[in-house]
Amino acid sequence: MSETTRLRIAIQKSGRLSKESQKLLKSCGVKFNVNEQRLIAHSDNMPIDLLRVRDDDIPGLVMDGVVDLGIIGENVLEEEQIERNSLGKPAECIKLRELDFGACRLSLAVPTEFNYQDASSLEGLRIATSYPNLLRRYMQEKGINYRDCMLKGSVEVAPRAGLSDGICDLVSTGATLEANGLYETEVIYRSMACIIQSTQSQPDDKQALINKILSRINGVVRAKESKYILLHAPTETLEQIVALLPGAENPTVLPLNDDTNRVAIHAVSTEDLFWDTMEQLTQLGASSILVMPIEKMMG
């Protein structure tokens, strides 16, 4: 693959998605070393360049075809698409899949002393946010007039500083809101990290590499959601035990040496194996129960 056809992937330079994005790519076998002073990191073993940029630059870089792939929060993607549509700029990209990190919600919040009934309680008030387009869309759908206060950061301090009556900001646990005397009132958007692709046509070798990376990402995500289960089971309760294994597909059943009344079961479960399930397995005579994480899956 020539220099001009190297796969370019944009990831967040710093912030809540940065480390998880790097971890995901390394789990997919992409080797690279990040120099905090440099924008670009070159892969050591694949024709891939990582561009480390601000998260709100990633959607535009993908939509304009500057990079081929981007890992971004859905909230940032949606905000940029609304903005670009309003300006008549290219706003198309291909969302390849959601990822298993970066979960958050964009919510309205008000001071604890505020008498909030519903969203109409914010009629005519000033709301601070870093997501004016998502907020505007929500408030228009509700038929609520408001004044916005655009901030790039530290949105949660706006009411206390006298800049706004309420806020619209990302929430993960709510601890930051509580620390600033606020409480969450409405969730207006739920978000996960996702991987997006440019709509520009790709050379065959580059598209093949994209497909390979996506296949590996699918395998990594599936592995995180799955567990490898091993146990010994009495033959007389075998069917009941298999039925208890959550999400198991065609478990492998093997005979045990010198024990015709028991078998070994190996299974991949796509759901969590909870303690109560393990206790039920034990009650049915299962023993030597092992539940192990899976690093990678394919096929």
From Swiss-Prot:
InterPro entries: ATP-PRT_HisG_long, ATP_PRibTrfase_cat, ATP_PRibTrfase_CS, ATP_PRibTrfase_HisG, HisG_C, N-reg_PII-like_a/b, N-reg_PII/ATP_PRibTrfase_C. It is an enzyme of class 2 (transferase). Pathway: Amino-acid biosynthesis; L-histidine biosynthesis; L-histidine from 5-phospho-alpha-D-ribose 1-diphosphate: step 1/9. Its cofactor is Mg(2+). It catalyses: 1-(5-phospho-beta-D-ribosyl)-ATP + diphosphate = 5-phospho-alpha-D-ribose 1-diphosphate + ATP. GO terms for biological process: L-histidine biosynthetic process. Feedback inhibited by histidine. Signal peptide: none annotated. It is found in: Cytoplasm. This is ATP phosphoribosyltransferase. It comes from Shewanella halifaxensis (strain HAW-EB4).
